[in-house]
């Protein structure tokens, strides 16, 4: 019985690759230094899998930045602006595409399906020239072979590559990207020929787009591609790997009818219906099924007994020698190694498995199927599963009851938004086009040091409070000097918008090294939600009241919304996600009520990640949006009409969910918009009726560039062409945490001047 891993984290157990990349980018180390770190990491990963007994070990899943960018390099599809002149693509061109350089911007980055990983989007057009320009896949196969490890080289499949691309600048938006299939397949043939010559016997094509809603034309491209590659692939075993959702019946039919393909990989965690499909539609005889039963996207130990039952039922259909135990997707979406968690509570730790432990689980399942079950290992797993089910720290009866009582009500505020805005205006007395910022202010080295020392107990609580108070006072003073209308306290006490709340809620645990790659060298460390969520004490009220006492202007209370906390955490898998979300919503609701009681009249509840949780298939959108929007309304349904509820959203493409956003029933919504002005405004141009306050970002905080007053005024005027004067707010598009004060002050100065300029124009037009 064989075992397989779809892919493995690249960063290293202690983020070795991150630090090597950043050192290289800063000019502090050489290309050779970076390559050495990468070579050592690859070798240790291959050795680890070989030692664990994995039969099908992947190669070419390592990347210096992103696997889709690696494919762009392999195909030589470098956009013209990078002035690449041919030959093997080196670090200079590769990292310019990923990060931009002094003279040209980076390629666009977008989310990889519904994960928190981001890929670099290929820019293609009818004139794109393709040539074999990066031999990485072959080099890494040979590198592993020299170490005595025979691997399965992994390539992003040709059809998914094109479906994930976008038309380059200047190319018609309607350009048919799939028309380039015949242009890229010759390069794939060259790569396949080299891999064969190097001794490869298996090859894995990742074609995750097969789980999306595809039309017949798109499905036909898979048949065309793998028919065209058939002779090149002869003599090789070919695995097509899918992940992140069920495979639709039509896609399954197309996939299983491909002659050149020997094996199919399915995600049986997110794809709970795929098992039924294999049973009902049948499975082609003589082909392999790679069964993704170990979750590649979470940190929970596998329920080995349950997985074994699934595998045994598949074995009856596929045959003993054709079933391979695998992960549901690449393990790059989970943390690296539990061994490095020395401070984690031992009971909670017994419920977890990171990437290194999941490799062992896959092999243990394969051996059990082959009649070599490790009884002690399985018994320990059964005990851990039982402890998790019965542990008193997981269940809080009071929370369960409160969450159950939410059903049957839609938790709307009693008065409609226009009446509320009138009541709020009487109390707040804001000018037309009120100015505000999104929440965070620059976090200086000194500020980070204070937080670090307080956490390490090197300074007293009094010293810490005094330092944070001083910072808040500075931020309030700056905003008053700039004449901003609705102030923020700058969030100096917060390291991260999710972790800060998770640390104060029960049901959350935190790791020391549970890092997961987000993009390039950037990693995130998601909290773990292991049990029922509740709020033992107020979390932000102390700081918000302190800040409000420093000014007569309205001070915003700042909270992270329940959907964002959920989508940016590793979530418990023993109850539906929406139940956990409702529990978080109830905890945030208590905080909102305490802020209101403490005299805070404007409360912002950020839902940066609301859209991120949208399922991959349209049929599932309505259910998700229904409970996500409901969770938001739960947080603030009990406040008075005079309390103004803001929310902030961090993505540009939400035209398709505008009605759900309206349904959130916030008083004011601020949106990251500056990079995609037209996209957002087109929604309102198309006649969507929107009556609440709205603040589309007037400048991009992700860039150090300081926008001029004229430029911001021009943006505001564009917005006023489609939005009513009395609902428009003026604000940056995101928090200012990552910027320097030397950038923030002039940018905000110009923003306030622009708002005043337009106010004067509007007044004189009357």
Swiss-Prot record:
UniProt GO molecular function: 5-methyltetrahydropteroyltriglutamate-homocysteine S-methyltransferase activity; zinc ion binding
Taxonomic placement: Eukaryota, Viridiplantae, Streptophyta, Embryophyta, Tracheophyta
Entry binding sites for Zn(2+) 1: 648, 650, 672, 734
Compartments where found: Cytoplasm, Cytosol
InterPro entries on file: Cbl-indep_Met_Synth_N, Cobalamin-indep_Met_synthase, Met_Synth_C/arc, UROD/MetE-like_sf
Residue numbers binding 5-methyltetrahydropteroyltri-L-glutamate: 18, 116, 496, 519, 522-523, 568
Cofactor stoichiometry and binding remark: Binds 2 Zn(2+) ions per subunit.
Protein name listed in UniProt: 5-methyltetrahydropteroyltriglutamate--homocysteine methyltransferase 2
EC class (word): transferase
Species name: Oryza sativa subsp. japonica
GO process annotations (BP): methionine biosynthetic process; methylation
Keywords of this entry: Amino-acid biosynthesis, Cytoplasm, Metal-binding, Methionine biosynthesis, Methyltransferase, Transferase, Zinc
């Amino acid at each position: 019985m064989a075992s397989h891993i779809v892919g493995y984290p690249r960063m290293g157990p202690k983020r070795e690759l991150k630090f090597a990349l950043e050192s290289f980018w800063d000019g502090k180390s050489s290309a050779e230094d970076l390559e050495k770190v990468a070579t050592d990491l690859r070798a240790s990963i291959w050795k680890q899998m070989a030692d664990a007994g994995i039969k099908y070990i992947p190669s070419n899943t390592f990347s210096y930045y992103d696997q889709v960018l690696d494919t762009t390099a392999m195909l030589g599809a470098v956009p013209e602006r990078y002035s690449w002149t041919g030959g093997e693509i080196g670090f200079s061109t590769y990292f310019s595409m990923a990060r931009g350089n002094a003279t040209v911007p980076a390629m666009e980055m977008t989310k990889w399906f519904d994960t928190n990983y981001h890929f670099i989007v290929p820019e293609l057009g009818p004139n794109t020239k393709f040539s074999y320009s990066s031999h990485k896949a072959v080099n890494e196969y040979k590198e592993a072979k020299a170490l005595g490890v025979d691997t399965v080289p992994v390539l992003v499949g040709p059809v998914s590559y094109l479906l994930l691309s976008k038309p380059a600048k200047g190319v018609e938006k309607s350009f048919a990207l799939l028309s380039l299939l015949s242009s890229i397949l010759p390069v794939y043939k060259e790569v396949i020929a080299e891999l064969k010559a190097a001794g490869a016997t298996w090859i894995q094509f990742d074609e995750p787009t097969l789980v999306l809603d595809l039309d017949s034309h798109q499905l036909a491209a898979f048949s065309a591609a793998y028919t065209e590659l058939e002779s090149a692939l002869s003599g090789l075993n070919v695995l097509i790997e899918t992940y992140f959702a069920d495979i639709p019946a039509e896609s399954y039919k197309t996939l299983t009818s491909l002659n050149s393909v020997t094996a199919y990989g399915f995600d049986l965690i997110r794809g709970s219906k795929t098992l039924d499909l294999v049973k009902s539609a049948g499975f082609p005889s003589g082909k392999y099924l790679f069964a993704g039963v170990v979750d590649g996207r979470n940190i929970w130990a596998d329920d080995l007994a349950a997985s074994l039952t699934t595998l045994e039922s598949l074995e009856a259909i596929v045959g003993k020698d054709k079933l391979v135990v695998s992960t549901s997707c690449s393990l790059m979406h989970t943390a690296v190694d539990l061994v490095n968690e020395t401070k984690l509570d031992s009971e909670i730790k017994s419920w977890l498995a990171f990437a290194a432990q999941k490799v062992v689980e896959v092999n243990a399942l394969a051996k059990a199927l082959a009649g070599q079950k490790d009884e002690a290992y399985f018994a320990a797993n059964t005990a851990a599963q039982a402890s998790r089910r019965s542990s008193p720290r997981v269940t809080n009866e009071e929370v369960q009851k409160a969450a159950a009582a939410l059903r049957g009500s839609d938790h709307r505020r009693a008065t409609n938004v226009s009446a509320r805005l009138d009541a709020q205006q009487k109390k707040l007395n804001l000018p037309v086009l009120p100015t505000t910022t999104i929440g965070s202010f620059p976090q200086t080295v000194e500020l980070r040091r204070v937080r670090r020392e307080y956490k390490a107990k090197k300074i007293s609580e009094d010293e810490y409070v005094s330092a944070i108070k001083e910072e808040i006072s500075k931020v309030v003073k700056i905003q008053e000097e700039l004449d901003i209308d609705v102030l923020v306290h700058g969030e100096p006490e917060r390291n991260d918008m999710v972790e800060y709340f998770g640390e104060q809620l029960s049901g959350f645990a935190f790791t020391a090294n549970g890092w997961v790659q987000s993009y390039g060298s950037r990693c995130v460390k998601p909290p773990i939600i292991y049990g029922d969520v509740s709020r033992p004490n107020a979390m932000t009220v102390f700081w918000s009241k302190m800040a409000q006492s420093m000014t007569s202007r309205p001070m915003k209370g700042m909270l992270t919304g329940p959907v964002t906390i959920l989508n940016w955490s590793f979530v418990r898998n023993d109850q539906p996600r929406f139940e956990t979300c409702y529990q978080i919503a109830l905890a945030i609701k208590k905080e909102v009520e305490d802020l209101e009681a403490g005299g805070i009249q404007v409360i912002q509840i950020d839902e940066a990640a609301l859209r991120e949780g949208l399922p991959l298939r349209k049929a599932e959108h309505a259910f998700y949006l229904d409970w996500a929007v409901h969770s938001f309304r739960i947080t603030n349904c009990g406040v008075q009409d005079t309390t103004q509820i803001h929310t902030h959203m961090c993505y540009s493409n939400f035209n398709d969910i505008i009605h759900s956003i309206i349904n959130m029933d916030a008083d004011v919504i601020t949106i990251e918009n500056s990079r995609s002005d037209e996209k957002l405004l087109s929604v309102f141009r198309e006649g969507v009726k929107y009556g609440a306050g709205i603040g589309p970002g007037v400048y991009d905080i992700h860039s150090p560039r300081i926008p001029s007053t004229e430029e911001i005024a021009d943006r505001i005027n564009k917005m006023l062409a489609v939005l009513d004067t009395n609902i428009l707010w003026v604000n940056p598009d995101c928090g200012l945490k990552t910027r320097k004060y030397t950038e923030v002050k002039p940018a905000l100065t110009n923003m306030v001047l622009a708002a005043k300029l337009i106010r004067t124009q509007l007044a004189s037009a009357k």
